[in-house]
């Protein structure tokens, strides 16, 4: 497995011992979740948007509406009084998102983060309190996908969070595809940090205080599926959904 290339943006400067430079660590963080935070500049204003993602060996794929400013870099339409115009849900969804080149030029470099909190580190002193975590940060100029490449990325996105669902559910229609934007962001420039273990004050002067210290773990677990109340009687979840109940997400 290759190493991550260090750049001015991804070089570990603080807490270097927590930094990981192997690409396997990046994939580990990305596999463990399906929600990322996409940071963009829109109209000179920073925006951080939560969205679903998927990935392959080379790219991170993020999903959203074709009318979303965060996924197109377009300025919002304005009414005569200067406020953002509400053009109606259907009109926004059918609005064109611009070409691949236009989207890349409008958005410039973006930053995507994925973070998993594994526990609270409760130390003897408040100063030493902390968090056990796994975190990845990806920089890149997004590329808007079209055609078969877009459909392939949608499958990757769907299968990442819900394995088996792409083949089980109805495939997207042309109108649905037109209303959806998929961006590809290269994984070439990425940074990973991980922190685990107990507090750092177990051998210092605070150890004599007689206070409890340790880690309060956190885990995200899939619960039993909740059926749509409009389902026909007797229709049960398919195996690829039901089998996940009681399992950990990450």
Please give the residue ranges for each predicted region.
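Short helix-to-loop capping/linker segments positioned immediately adjacent to catalytic or ligand/cofactor-binding
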Residues: 37-40, 124-125, 142-145, 166-173
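Short, surface-exposed beta-edge/turn micro-motifs
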Residues: 33-36, 107-110, 180-182
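An N-terminal domain-cap segment
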Residues: 6-61, 71-73
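A generic structural motif
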Residues: 60-64, 183-184
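Structural motif
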Residues: 59, 109, 135, 141, ...
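Short, structured beta-strand-loop surface elements
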Residues: 66-87, 94-156
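C-terminal edge-of-domain segments
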Residues: 1-10, 147-250
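A structural signal for short, well-ordered beta-strand segments
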Residues: 53, 140-142, 187
């Amino acid at each position: 497995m290759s190493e991550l290339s260090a750049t001015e943006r991804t070089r570990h400067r603080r807490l270097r011992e927590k930094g990981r430079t192997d690409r396997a660590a990046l994939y580990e963080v990305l596999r463990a979740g399906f929600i990322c935070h996409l940071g963009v500049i829109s109209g000179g204003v920073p925006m951080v948007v939560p969205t679903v993602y998927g990935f392959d060996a080379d790219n991170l794929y993020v999903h959203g509406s074709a009318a979303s400013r965060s996924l197109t870099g377009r300025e919002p339409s304005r009414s005569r009084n200067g406020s953002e115009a509400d053009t109606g849900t259907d009109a926004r969804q059918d609005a064109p998102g611009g070409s691949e080149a236009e989207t890349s030029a409008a958005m410039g470099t973006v930053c995507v983060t994925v973070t998993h909190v594994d526990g609270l580190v409760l130390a003897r002193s408040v100063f030493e309190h902390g968090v056990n975590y796994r975190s990845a940060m990806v920089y890149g100029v997004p590329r808007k996908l079209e055609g078969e490449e877009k459909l392939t990325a949608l499958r990757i996105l769907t299968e990442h969070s819900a394995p088996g669902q792409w083949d089980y559910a109805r495939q997207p229609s042309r109108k649905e595809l037109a209303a959806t934007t998929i961006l590809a962001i290269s994984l070439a420039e990425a940074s990973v940090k991980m922190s685990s273990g107990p507090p750092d004050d177990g051998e210092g002067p605070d150890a004599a205080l007689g206070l409890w210290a340790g880690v309060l773990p956190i885990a995200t677990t899939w619960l039993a599926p909740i059926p749509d109340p409009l389902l026909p009687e007797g229709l049960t979840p398919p195996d690829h959904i039901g089998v996940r109940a009681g399992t950990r997400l990450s």
